[in-house]
Amino acid sequence: MLAVELVIVLLAIFLGARLGGIGIGFAGGLGVLALALIGVKPGNIPFDVISIIMAVIAAISAMQVAGGMDYLVQQTEKLLRKNPKHITILAPIVTYFLTIFAGTGNISLSALPVIAEVAKEQGIKPCRPLST
């Protein structure tokens, strides 16, 4: 029985990875449904955690549509290009504040290409500002 459950979970993960975006959530729901159909008893639903995650996703989606993420990345680029010598110190600080302002660390992924580009222009290995 454990092998069947493992196969269902892995198939749901694979399907979600192939679909991407909102499909990840649908694949997870499909996996839970399949597990319930074979008799696995679901546990208590953590509504508090789900509500927090949904609120953060809704907020970041609204910010993306309104252009807020683009604005924050533009401000990041301005700051890093004005102070390129200090990129090793500024890059982690900027990504920290992006995470605080957006409520999720996913916005930091938008700033990584900017950080890498400015570092390369200064002759600094991009791994230094990206890893600190």
From Swiss-Prot:
The keyword Cell membrane applies. It catalyses: fumarate(in) + L-aspartate(out) = fumarate(out) + L-aspartate(in); fumarate(in) + succinate(out) = fumarate(out) + succinate(in); (S)-malate(in) + succinate(out) = (S)-malate(out) + succinate(in); L-aspartate(in) + succinate(out) = L-aspartate(out) + succinate(in). The chain crosses the membrane at residues 20-40, 49-69, 87-107. Responsible for the transport of C4-dicarboxylates during aerobic and anaerobic growth. Required for the uptake of L-aspartate as a nitrogen source during aerobic growth. The uptake of L-aspartate in aerobic conditions is coupled to the excretion of fumarate, resulting in the net uptake of nitrogen without carbon uptake. In addition, during anaerobic growth, catalyzes the uptake of fumarate, malate or aspartate coupled to the export of succinate. May play a a general role in anaerobic C4-dicarboxylate transport. InterPro entries: Anaer_Dcu_memb_transpt. It is a multi-pass membrane protein. Keywords: Antiport, Cell inner membrane, Cell membrane, Membrane, Transmembrane, Transmembrane helix, Transport. Belongs to the DcuA/DcuB transporter (TC 2.A.13.1) family. GO terms for molecular function: antiporter activity; C4-dicarboxylate transmembrane transporter activity. It is found in: Cell inner membrane. One of its GO terms (cellular component) is plasma membrane. This is C4-dicarboxylate transporter DcuA. Pfam families: DcuA_DcuB.
